[in-house]
């Protein structure tokens, strides 16, 4: 996530104008607004003969005059249904053994065995819901909507020192939520809803599937998303291709494109972005950037920011320091991993691609040292700078992420390149920091930097690893950049200490 934000978060020019005149980068995140109902079907009232046939098939209506059907409607489309309030039934839609109140049913949709599909009041269907991500007390609240991106959410949560920009984006989201408000819910074309119990104030997108959900309330299930057995979700949005299954419990959550939440996972006030996969455990007030992964029952992710992350069994954090309350937060930069049994007491921060092992209670800040190991030694947090540069696990992770990208819309901007200015610059800063420590105390056996212990031998090893990696990274960026591609095409690319013949 950090890599994908450099072009946005790293430039102050994007906020140089007045909030009311935010430039185009924000319009693509927020103002991709389509009409609330783009169904062009012409509807009519059912004829007396059709009403008689419908009644004979076990159907009933609170008021048949409030029911509208497509021009080519046939009574065979309904069986054993109760219709209340205003209901529109699209071409070829099939309704079996269900109760429907105040809904538009798209063409070829299937609704079968549903206790109640109802819109009881005017609703924005999850758009505009406030999610207390990162900080459990709401200091970094993000308002969700069905086209939310990781980039927009990041700016809303992190750029609190730019209040005018945050307020401007929130106003845009508020207008978007107002545009979505309606007294009728929508079931999109070719959607399938089977075996569900209570679905209330939920918009269901084209081709979405709801199979056996227990309770869905005030939300949006976007096109192609799947909601399965025993799921309970309130104030939520499931983006395109998201899969929520296996008794998952959600409250005030956003599940991004192609996210998977499964196997009794529980989440409150959390954001999950592209291709994240969480099972069994729980999450509270987290910002889960793309590819955040947690598979184990005993894992708790709380009050933090993650991306390209993997939590081991029993991984845990604490954001509550008793007298001060649950006001703290942690940041685990791109590519961090927690080993089994890892514990971190917030506030704390780790640099990109850091492997964390053991218990850490001293509120470390290792953000200046990418590709490191942070381990527990004699009750202290010991840092091994650059140690992860020698791990094949990091190489494997970097290679597998683009291969596992299942998205079609690709609303989140993700940079998969491992050789980039963000990481190269981080390693250069790490070398400068290590050299400063060594020069200040050349004979020391160990150093302490931001509550992390660094052994002298590990410092020297880290310098060697970082310097090698910097050279390799800069070479790769030059080779893969536009000048490098042009040089290769012309046969003038420098390789090692030789040039092509004749140069």
Language-model segments: which ranges?
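Core alpha-helical transmembrane segments of integral membrane proteins
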Residues: 187, 191-225, 229, 235
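Short, Lys/Arg-enriched N-terminal segments with co-localized hydrophobic residues
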Residues: 21-39
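Residue-identity detector for glycine
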Residues: 9-10
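Glycine-rich hexapeptide-repeat left-handed beta-helix
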Residues: 41-64, 95, 99-177, 211-214, ...
């Amino acid at each position: 996530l950090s890599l994908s934000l450099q072009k946005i978060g790293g430039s102050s020019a994007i906020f140089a104008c007045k909030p009311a005149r935010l430039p185009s980068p924000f319009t693509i995140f927020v103002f991709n607004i389509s009409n609330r109902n783009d169904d062009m079907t012409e509807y009519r009232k059912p004829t007396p003969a059709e009403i008689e046939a419908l009644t004979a098939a076990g159907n009933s209506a609170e008021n048949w005059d409030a029911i509208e059907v497509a021009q080519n409607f046939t009574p065979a489309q309904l069986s054993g249904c109760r219709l209340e309030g205003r209901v529109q039934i699209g071409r070829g839609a099939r309704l079996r053994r269900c109760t429907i109140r105040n809904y538009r049913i798209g063409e070829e949709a299937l609704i079968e065995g549903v206790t109640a599909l109802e819109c009881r009041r005017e609703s924005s269907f999850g758009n505009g819901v406030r999610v207390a991500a990162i900080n459990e007390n709401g200091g970094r609240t993000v308002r969700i909507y069905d086209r939310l991106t990781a980039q927009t959410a990041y700016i809303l949560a992190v750029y609190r020192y730019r209040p005018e920009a945050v307020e401007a984006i929130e106003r845009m989201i508020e207008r978007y939520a107002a545009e979505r408000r309606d007294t009728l819910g929508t079931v999109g074309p070719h959607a399938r809803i089977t075996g569900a119990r209570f679905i209330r104030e939920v918009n269901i997108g084209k081709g979405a599937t709801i199979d056996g959900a227990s309770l869905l309330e005030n939300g949006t299930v976007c096109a192609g998303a799947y909601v399965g057995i025993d799921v309970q979700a309130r104030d939520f949005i499931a983006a395109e291709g998201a899969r929520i299954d296996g008794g998952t419990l959600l409250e005030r959550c956003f599940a991004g494109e192609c996210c998977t939440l499964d196997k009794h996972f529980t989440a409150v006030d959390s954001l999950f972005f592209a291709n994240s996969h969480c099972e069994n455990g729980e999450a509270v007030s987290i910002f889960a950037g793309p590819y955040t992964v947690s598979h184990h029952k005993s894992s708790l992710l709380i009050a933090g920011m993650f991306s390209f992350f993997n939590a081991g069994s029993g991984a845990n954090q604490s954001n509550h320091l008793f007298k001060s309350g649950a006001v703290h937060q942690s940041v685990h930069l791109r590519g961090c991993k927690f080993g089994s049994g890892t514990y971190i007491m917030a506030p704390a921060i780790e640099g990109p691609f850091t492997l964390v092992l053991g218990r850490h209670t001293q509120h470390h800040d290792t953000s200046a040292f990418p590709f490191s190991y942070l381990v527990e030694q004699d009750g202290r947090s010991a840092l091994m700078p650059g140690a992860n540069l020698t791990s094949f696990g990091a190489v494997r992770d970097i290679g597998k992420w683009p291969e596992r990208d299942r998205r079609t819309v690709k609303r989140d901007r993700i940079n998969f390149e491992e050789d980039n200015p963000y990481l190269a610059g981080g390693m250069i800063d790490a070398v400068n920091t290590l050299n400063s420590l060594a020069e200040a105390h050349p004979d020391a056996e160990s150093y302490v930097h931001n509550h992390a212990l660094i052994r002298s031998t590990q410092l020297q090893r880290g310098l060697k690893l970082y310097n090698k990696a910097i050279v390799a990274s800069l070479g790769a960026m030059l080779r893969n950049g536009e000048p490098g591609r042009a040089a290769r095409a012309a046969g003038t690319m420098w390789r090692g200490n030789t040039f092509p013949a004749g140069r």
